[in-house]
Structure formats: structure tokens, C-alpha cells
Amino acid sequence: MKLISWNVNGIRACITKGFEDRFKELDADIFCLQETKCQQGQVELELPGYHQYWNYANRRGYSGTAVFTKKEPLSVVNGIGIEAHDKEGRVITLEFEEFYFVTVYTPNSQSE
């Protein structure tokens, strides 16, 4: 199984630099992104053969995660159940028959 995790630091800018070609070339079974920095409806990716799951931050241009998987999961949960953290779109958990897959974009270590 091939897993890829990529902090894109803004998916819209990444798309203009050839993201979709690189995505196809890498041919991962599960591909996760952190720091997507987009809102629902701002990005439409054509990724045939993949199921797409997004967790958007409430704040525009901030954090956000996504997972693209060839196999459809049994369930998908956005967040960890703590509203203060979940509004930032930092976690997606996918349940598969034999394992759980979690992508996380963690905050930096600043004092706030």
C-alpha cells in the first residue's frame, strides 16, 4: 500500500504548479493533504478512481485537510469532537475494514 502525506501550504497555488499531474504520477492508494487553505466550492479536482474527503477551516485561507483514497472507507469523521479545534479543519479519520487512517495538520508551537 502506498501512502503519501503532503503539506501543500495552499492547494489553489499548488494546482497552478502542476499538482494534478504530480498526483497522477505518484499513484498513491491514499493521498492526504494538510494546510489546504480553501473553502468548500473553491477547488474542484478531477481525480478519477479516488474518493475525496475534505475538512475545511471556518476561517478563510487557514489550515484545512483532505484525503483522497482509491478504496471507499466504511466511515469518515472530521475533527476530534472538540469544537474549538474542529473549526480549524485539522483532522480527518477514515475507517477501513482492516485499519484506521488519520491525517492531522498540527498547530505550530507558538504560545497561543
Task: Outline where the language-model segments fall.
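N-terminal, active-site-proximal structural segment of metallo-dependent hydrolase catalytic domains
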Residues: M1-L47, A57, Y62
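Structured beta-strand-rich core segments of catalytic domains in phosphoester-bond hydrolases
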Residues: K37, V43-S111
